[in-house]
Design a protein with these regions (language model features):
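Signature aromatic-anchored transmembrane alpha helix within multi-pass, membrane-resident enzymes
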Residues: 9-19, 219, 253, 325-335, ...
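Transmembrane signal-anchor helices characteristic of membrane glycosylation enzymes that use polyprenol
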Residues: 10-42, 47-48, 57-64, 150, ...
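Catalytic lumenal/periplasmic loop and adjoining terminal transmembrane helix
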Residues: 26-32, 75-76, 255-260, 265-284, ...
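Interfacial juxtamembrane loops and adjacent helix segments
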Residues: 40-121, 349-371, 514-515
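Transmembrane-helix motifs of polytopic, lipid-linked glycan transferases
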Residues: 114, 118-139, 177, 181
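Hydrophobic, aromatic-rich transmembrane alpha-helices
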Residues: 130-132, 295-331, 335, 339, ...
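Hydrophobic/aromatic-rich transmembrane helices and adjacent perimembrane loops
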Residues: 161, 168-171, 204, 213, ...
Length: 627
């Protein structure tokens, strides 16, 4: 029966099963946390960026559609699809607050959080399906599409980020789909894929300016496809495809700009916003000469195709066609060596004695003051390597290594389809290398959110590796292939249980427990509030929290962060409980030192180590009893 199952039926059944797991894992937690900056998006039910965007459309206040410099419009659109339907009369669900002390309505906030998050979560589930379908159109390999969907649906980090009301939540999904749609275009030459890629790229740029990296990657795709896919064609065919690739690239750019401007009309009123959200993205000052060079090459190449009938370019590509395998081998070696170097550096402590910096320091002096390429590289690659499930990491490396060896990939794939797979591996590897190069150029230490575009790239490479490995098994023994797939999926799914329900804090077991690459960022606040809510007279208690995530779920009164210094002139003896976390204590170090000295009991009454890592903690203290 399994042998008779067609690829289409298999993909359909597999998709719904994986989608069911994705929904079952993620939906129950949507209303049980608040993370960094979400209060700026929707936590206040009468204002915030989501409300600002939808109100701007309602009142035709077009300038107000620019809600943030990210710009986060895609996030606001998806979050606002269900949130405002729930917030019919938000003011009726608030308690009285003042500048310092707030009182929340936990039941309301929990339900509102669910509605503001579910649109993003469902959209990303649909986009994972689209990614799987595009991979099927590109490779015609049902197993590859299945493994890709599985690794994406079962990724703790991607599930976690999809639960957030944050621009990064939609960056990875729209960006990956846009890239694959353009790959489908250069492979099949159908304009509908270019149109789809342009629309998706527009949504990517509306998510976050980091999506501008796709300008460079799609540019590379347009040219590299001529080498990897079309170098052996006739000169006339090569010329036709070359012109189509360039025009398709320009169409994608124009459509992305049109989508950007139409969904953020502020860009039509002030074109500066259009520039800053696309080509003039943050840090673009260093890339202006590169953009000019890219434009010059594009114009020169198009002129050669039109006026010289591709005599030079076809001859050059035909001569360079033997570089395809060396290029992929080079990328495979760079990535494999990078992963091995990262594992050697950190999996058994700081083996090489590198200088360290907090993973969330970004452009902080703790990182920028570090000298030495290898030290910086070890810090840059650490989050990606140690927050990727081991099964995915292993098969991603296997994908690049097996794909780089012609004899091995020919055994698993037909000649026609192996060219598409090799090209995909080249692009995915190029994205990773280009991303880290840009991070070095920007002097910024990337963490999980900053590098979110890389996780689907690694997952797709892992799917290629799994498909290549599976095709080495005898085709007549269907049970062996299904057994291999089941074991691999079970291994991957175990990662979901590791840090559940705090999926965005997932860290694999390759990193020692006393080390961290992620922070709570509001996780654990709900659990701390649930603990205090069960204590006697909690509704009359006053608590202080050093970070987001606690106050909205606490039944009593609450003070957050540094604002406590304004409470009764710095007299803290009325505060009953204190909620502390790693990130919060860094931000409120001096205040916490004063609180510990004056009023806080030395031992916590409740502790949560997220992922079993003591460095990623949430603790609750009570006030010290007077002597």
């Amino acid at each position: 029966m399994l042998r008779q199952l067609s690829p289409h039926h298999f993909l359909r059944i597999a998709f719904f099963a994986l989608l069911g797991i994705y929904l079952a894992v993620g939906l129950p937690h949507l209303g049980k946390f608040q993370t960094a900056d979400e209060d700026l998006w929707f936590a206040n039910p009468e204002e915030g960026r989501v409300h600002q965007y939808w109100d701007a459309w309602r009142h035709h206040a077009w300038e107000e559609t620019r809600i943030n410099d990210k710009p986060g419009v895609t996030t606001a659109i998806l979050s606002g699809m269900f949130g405002p339907l729930y917030d019919r009369h938000p003011s009726d669900k608030l308690k009285d607050n003042d500048f310092i002390v707030t009182s929340a309505h936990p039941a309301y906030f929990k339900e509102a959080s669910f509605f503001y998050r579910i649109g993003i979560y469902l959209a990303n589930g649909a986009l994972i399906w689209l990614i799987g379908w595009l991979l099927w159109r590109i490779t015609r390999n049902p197993w590859l599409s299945f493994f890709a969907a599985a690794f994406l649906f079962l990724s703790p980090i991607l599930i976690g980020v999809s639960q957030l009301v944050n621009p990064d939540a939609t960056l990875w999904s729209f960006g990956t789909a846009s890239l694959l749609a353009y790959v489908a275009f250069v492979l099949h030459g159908r304009w509908r894929y270019a149109i789809l890629s342009g629309a998706l790229l527009g949504m990517t740029l509306l998510s976050k300016y980091t999506g501008a990296i796709l300008f460079f990657l799609l540019y590379l795709t347009a040219f590299a496809s001529l080498l990897f896919l079309h170098a052996d064609t006739s000169r006339e065919t090569f010329r036709r495809i070359g012109i189509m690739n360039i025009l398709g690239y320009l169409l994608v750019l124009l459509l992305s700009l049109a989508v950007f401007a139409l969904l953020m009309p502020a860009a039509l009123i002030d074109p500066r916003y259009l520039w800053e959200g696309t080509f003039g993205f943050k840090g673009a000052a260093n890339t202006t000469p590169v953009l000019a060079l890219m434009g010059g090459i594009l114009l020169a190449f198009l002129s050669e195709l039109i006026f010289l009938k591709a005599r030079l370019s076809h001859t050059a590509m035909h001569a360079l066609r033997y570089l395809k395998t060396p290029l992929l081998i080079a990328i495979a070696c760079i990535i494999t060596a990078g992963v091995a170097f990262t594992l050697l550096s950190w999996s058994d402590g700081n083996r090489f004695g590198f200088e360290t910096a907090p993973f969330d320091t970004s452009r902080g002096s703790e990182y920028t003051s570090i000298q030495g390429f290898w030290n910086q590289l070890a810090l840059q690659t650490k989050p990606l390597v140690f927050t990727t499930p081991p099964a995915v990491l292993l098969f991603a490396l296997l994908g690049w290594l097996l794909g780089a060896i012609p004899a091995l990939r020919k055994h698993a794939l037909s000649n026609k389809h192996q060219h598409a797979v090799v090209f995909l591996l080249f692009l995915l590897g190029s994205l990773i290398i280009l991303f880290f190069y840009a991070a070095f150029e920007q002097h910024i230490l990337v963490h999980v959110r900053y590098s979110i575009l890389l996780y689907p790239a690694v997952a797709i490479a892992a799917a290629i590796g799994a498909a290549l490995a599976l095709h080495t098994l005898p085709k007549r023994h269907t049970w062996m292939r299904w057994g291999f797939a089941s074991i691999l999926l079970l291994w991957s799914a175990l990662s979901l249980a590791a840090d559940r329900p705090f999926h965005f804090n997932y860290t694999n077991d390759l990193l020692p427990r006393n080390d961290d690459v992620t922070g709570a960022w509001g996780y654990g606040g709900y659990e701390a509030a649930q603990f205090l809510n069960t204590r006697f007279f909690s509704e009359y208690a006053l608590a202080w929290s050093d970070y987001e995530g606690f106050c909205p779920f606490f039944h009593g009164r609450c003070i957050k962060g540094s604002i406590v210094k304004w409470y009764k002139g710095g007299d803290f003896k009325d505060i009953d409980y204190f909620v502390a976390s790693r990130r919060g204590l860094i931000r409120n170090e001096s205040i916490w030192r004063k609180l510990k000295r004056d009023v806080v009991h030395p031992e916590p009454i409740w502790t949560l180590y997220i992922g079993g890592r003591p460095g990623n903690f949430v603790e609750v203290y009570k006030k010290r009893e007077p002597l």
